[in-house]
Structures are given as structure tokens and as C-alpha cells.
Regions:
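Helix-to-loop junction immediately C-terminal to a conserved catalytic motif
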Residues: 52
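Conserved coupling/switch loops of ABC nucleotide-binding domains, chiefly the family-specific signature
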Residues: 58-61, 219, 251
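Conserved ABC transporter NBD signature motif
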Residues: 60-72
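ABC ATPase nucleotide-binding domains
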Residues: 84-86, 90, 94-242
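Glycine/charge-rich catalytic "coupling/switch" loops of P-loop NTPases
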Residues: 233, 261-263, 267-315, 339-356
Length: 356
């Protein structure tokens, strides 16, 4: 439904130019929810702005619903107002001099061909019912809470029944509790409408919870994409592992590798562990073993197959505790149930659930 091929964008700078996008390729099928996730400056918002028609790419092409809306080689650049999209900005961009009805109705009033007044009213009220704001149609925008303004912004983006919905960090201005609530509401809204969605965020929780596909961006490129569980559980590199939650890294050398399983001798002679691997590895190759804090099982008595560590720090977090453990020269993080009670300086034994 949305197809992007070879997208590039360079901004002029005093020292010659900054390449914000370095060949972006991806597709979103009809009804899909695709998230661009990354730190500030990675290129995610530039990609969305190119799709919206707010930026003109230097290279590559963009198609929405089979229609080419940007093609640098052919000189095609369809203006934003002629693209079949809905857009929600980070700031919501609710017009303060209008009431809720007028805010949502505006896209219909300026579109061509014009709609009859009765049709506009019906479409606006339908959109407001979708977001639970039908009783606020006559409320002034300045008298809305942050969550209500966000709902109005969603209604305005959907009122034209666009082929593609673009969301530019729409939850980032909300407090933590409201952000979590709105995350569920947004999922339900998109599920009910079936609209194809491109979502931009730096928040890994939003990306993992809502997306069909997550694409992690860094340095103007997509460094890994896939289903949320796959990208989180099987990161391709340190960049992805570090950005998506907490990650532990252990250096080692491959002892043996076959049938998707590698035996790795950890540096410092601490131990040998067995880990899954999608790469073709040769004995003697240096590797990073990457695993999550929740993949570490911790106990206070030695058991066959466990690895001895020293507890460096314990941080109580309510339902769980986080341990910082020293294994040789490496520091590891582990999520531990409060029933396991240790203090800094104690010995502990761990099992790494690398097969997960």
C-alpha cells in the first residue's frame, strides 16, 4: 500500500551537506501498522515528512495506494494537499480559535470537490464518535485537556477516510499514565478503521506494543526491521540491542557452530555457553553474545550448569529487583524476583536462557 524505494535526502550545511536519509526501502501492506523507531536525528521524521509531502527527497520514489507521489528521477512531487493521507503532529496542531467541530471539519471544507454541508456534518460526527468526542463538538479547543486534544487530532486526520495515516510521535506530550491509556485507545481505533499506518517514535514501548512491523533506524538507514518479538528477541547488532531495552554483552570465541547453534567460550575463561545463531560462524571467530536482563535466572546457591558471579548492586523496583552482577571483567544486569534476596558483595549463580 505504501512503497518506498531508495529514498535519500540531504540538507545543505556550511561544511557541504548532511545526508539525513541514505537509501530507505520498505513497504507497508494494506491495513498494516509500521513503526520507524530511533533516536533523535536518525532520519525517522524526515522519512515521514517525505511521505507527507512536507519534504522533497533528493532520490528514490514513494507510492501510496499504487499512485506515485514522489519520484526524484522523473521529477514527480505531488503536493501534500493532493496526497491521500491523514497526519497527526506531535503538537496536535489544534486551532485554538475554532471549536472541536470546526477543527475536524476543516479538511472536508477545503477539499475538492466540495461536500454538501449535511455530508460534512455526518462525516465529522462519525469521526468524533470514533474517538469518543461526539459530546464535545461545540467545545472550544482551548478548553480541552491534552488527551482530548489528541483525540480531536486523530478525528481530524481520519475524517477524510485517507488511504494512509501518518503519526509523528503523537503520544510524546502526554504524561506517563495517560500515554499508556492512549496507546490502547489508538490500537483499538486503528484496528476498527483498518487504516494503513506509518508511526514515528523514539519510545520503544510504543513501538513494541502497537506495531505489526518495527524498523529501527540509525544514521539515516534502517538497521533492522521485523515483527516486534523478532527484533527485540533476536537483535542483529549492538545498535538494535541497546536501543530496544536493556541488553547484556559478553565477548567470546566460537568453539563450535552447527545447525543454528554456537558454542562460545567467554573471554576470561569464565565458562562456555550455547547460544542460537542465524549467522554462519567459524571456530575461533570473535563474537558478542547478546541477551536481555529477563533472560538471566539468578539463584543464591550453586547448581549444575550455573555461572558464579558477584552481586555489585541491587535496585528494588516494586514487583521485581534489578541486580548488577560482575562476571570477570563484565557487568551484567538481571531481573530478579524479590523472593531472591541478596546484597552487594554476595555471591550469586546465574543461568543465561540464551535459547530465548
Amino acid at each position: 500500500m505504501l512503497t518506498i524505494r531508495g529514498l535519500t535526502k540531504t540538507y545543505a550545511t556550511p561544511d557541504g551537506g548532511f545526508q539525513a536519509l541514505k537509501g530507505i526501502d520498505f513497504e507497508i501492506p494494506q491495513g498494516g501498522f509500521y513503526t520507524l523507531l530511533g533516536e533523535s536525528g536518525c532520519g525517522k521524521s524526515t522519512t515521514l515528512r517525505c511521505v507527507a509531502g512536507l519534504e522533497e527527497p533528493d532520490g528514490g520514489s514513494i507510492s501510496i495506494g499504487g499512485e506515485v507521489v514522489a519520484d526524484a528521477e522523473r521529477g514527480v512531487q505531488v503536493p501534500a494537499f493532493d496526497r491521500d493521507i491523514g497526519l497527526v503532529f506531535q503538537s496536535y496542531a489544534i486551532w485554538p480559535h475554532m471549536d472541536v467541530f470546526a477543527n475536524v471539519a476543516y479538511p472536508l471544507r477545503v477539499q475538492r470537490p466540495r461536500l454538501a454541508a449535511a455530508d460534512i456534518k455526518a462525516r465529522v460526527m462519525e469521526a468524533l464518535r470514533l474517538v469518543g468526542m461526539e459530546d464535545f463538538a461545540n467545545r472550544q479547543a482551548t478548553k480541552l485537556s491534552g488527551g482530548q486534544q489528541q483525540r480531536v487530532a486523530f478525528a481530524r486526520a481520519l475524517v477524510r477516510r485517507p488511504k494512509l495515516l501518518l503519526l509523528d510521535e503523537p503520544l510524546s506530550n502526554l504524561d506517563a499514565k495517560l500515554r499508556e491509556q492512549m496507546r490502547f485507545e489508538l490500537q483499538e481505533l486503528i484496528s476498527r478503521t483498518g487504516v494503513t499506518t506509518l508511526y514515528v517514535t523514539h519510545d520503544q514501548s510504543e513501538a513494541l506494543a502497537m506495531s505489526d512491523t518495527v524498523a529501527v533506524m540509525a544514521g539515516g538507514r534502517i538497521v533492522q526491521s521485523g515483527a516486534p518479538r523478532e527484533v527485540y528477541g533476536r537483535p542483529d547488532n549492538r545498535t538494535v540491542a541497546n536501543f530496544l531495552g536493556s541488553a547484556n554483552f559478553l565477548r567470546g570465541k566460537v568453539v563450535d557452530a552447527r545447525d543454528g547453534l554456537a558454542t562460545v567460550a567467554l573471554d576470561g575463561g569464565a565458562t562456555t555457553i550455547h547460544v542460537p545463531s542465524r549467522a554462519t560462524l567459524s571456530p575461533g571467530a570473535s563474537v558478542d553474545v547478546i541477551f536481555r536482563p529477563e533472560d538471566v535466572t539468578t539463584c543464591l546457591e550453586p547448581v549444575d550448569g550455573t555461572i558464579e558471579c558477584i552481586v555489585e548492586r541491587v535496585v528494588f523496583q516494586g514487583g521485581m529487583s534489578e541486580y548488577q552482577l560482575r562476571l570477570g571483567s563484565a557487568l551484567l544486569r538481571a531481573v530478579v524476583h524479590p523472593s531472591v534476596s541478596a546484597q552487594a558483595g554476595d555471591r550469586a549463580w546465574i543461568t543465561i536462557q540464551a535459547e530465548r
